[in-house]
């Protein structure tokens, strides 16, 4: 089909979520009671809020914390990026039709550099570097609208599968059993 495009085109079109064709497609998903899983970079969170506002009957799942970038021109700006990301996540979480999928921060694009280590990251290293993203999302969206996700096999370059799930247990240790059930099972089932 002449209208189909490759993955590379997605990266060239930073405003794709705002196009009429894209939003017509989202309307169809909502009509069919399907979900839209959104993955974009941190500077595009406001576009997810816009499509959530335009499509209130559509469940949108925010993937990978909306991809906070930590490489290239963003390298070394972790705290600056986190502050902007935090503000935008708080605003996005006001949309009841948006759920948060918690995981996928072990990718090289996020700049934590776990993939460069001699051995895969430990759960304690993950807690040290990423805890603030997890806790901010859980606080903003509340546990009932959050679900842990592995993002395997992509995360395999940085962390082992069982260590990742141990990390999730450490992140959630101070939450109630009901809240843990939401994040480990109920929210995903609801979606």
Q: What is each residue range found by the language model?
A:
Residues 1-11:
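Single conserved hydrophobic/aromatic residue that forms the stacking wall/gate
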Residues 132-136, 140-147, 154-191:
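Mid-to-C-terminal alpha-helical segments outside catalytic/metal-binding sites
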């Amino acid at each position: 089909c002449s209208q189909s495009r490759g993955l590379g085109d997605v990266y060239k079109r930073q405003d794709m979520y705002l196009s009429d064709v894209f939003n017509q497609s989202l309307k169809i998903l909502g009509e069919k009671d399907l979900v839209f899983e959104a993955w974009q970079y941190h500077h595009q969170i406001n576009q997810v809020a816009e499509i959530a506002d335009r499509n209130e009957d559509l469940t949108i799942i925010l993937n990978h914390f909306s991809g906070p970038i930590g490489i290239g021109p963003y390298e070394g700006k972790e705290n600056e990026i986190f502050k902007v990301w935090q503000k935008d996540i708080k605003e996005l979480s006001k949309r009841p039709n948006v759920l948060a999928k918690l995981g996928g921060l072990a990718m090289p694009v996020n700049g934590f550099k776990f993939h460069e280590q001699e051995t895969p990251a430990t759960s304690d290293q993950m807690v040290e570097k990423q805890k603030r993203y997890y806790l901010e999302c859980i606080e903003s969206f509340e546990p009932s609208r959050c679900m842990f996700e592995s993002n395997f096999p992509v995360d395999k370059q940085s962390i082992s599968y069982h260590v990742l799930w141990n990390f999730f247990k450490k992140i959630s240790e101070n939450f109630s059993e009901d809240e843990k059930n939401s994040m480990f099972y109920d929210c995903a089932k609801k979606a």
